[in-house]
């Protein structure tokens, strides 16, 4: 596959975020358009239907802030259900808790998981093992 360097833009309520880089994969699944782009500053980034999801650069800030406040607020941490999270980052953070014996990740779009495992495996880390 030939990789294409281009600009990808996300638009939201009168604002625009542009990202220049090499498109590693652009695929339409049954549910959405999935893009992984390699950017000089952010590293690899995942976009779904034109919306920024995560990147190597900001992954830890998003997933750590999503998981740790929630899990720190409960005493019994044995089973976790993740709805969405096909990039694996939320599950990766949950794996850090030894009290958790079971993590169920439910993602409607199996292509997001397949693409994340191939192009963004560092984000899922230990969760994919």
Residue ranges and their predicted role:
Residues 1-45:
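N-terminal auxiliary segments of SAM/dcSAM-dependent transferases
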């Amino acid at each position: 596959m030939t990789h294409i360097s281009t600009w990808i833009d996300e638009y939201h309520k009168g604002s625009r975020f542009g990202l220049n880089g090499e498109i590693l994969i652009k695929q339409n699944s049954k549910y959405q358009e999935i893009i992984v782009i390699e950017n000089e500053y952010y590293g690899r980034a995942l976009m779904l239907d034109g919306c920024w999801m995560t990147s190597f650069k900001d992954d830890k800030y998003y997933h750590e802030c999503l998981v740790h406040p929630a899990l720190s607020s409960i005493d019994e941490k044995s089973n976790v259900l993740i709805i969405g999270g096909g990039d694996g980052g939320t599950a990766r953070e949950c794996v850090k808790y030894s009290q958790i014996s079971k993590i169920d990740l439910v993602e409607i779009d199996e292509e997001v998981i397949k693409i994340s495992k191939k192009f963004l495996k560092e984000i899922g880390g230990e969760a994919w093992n």
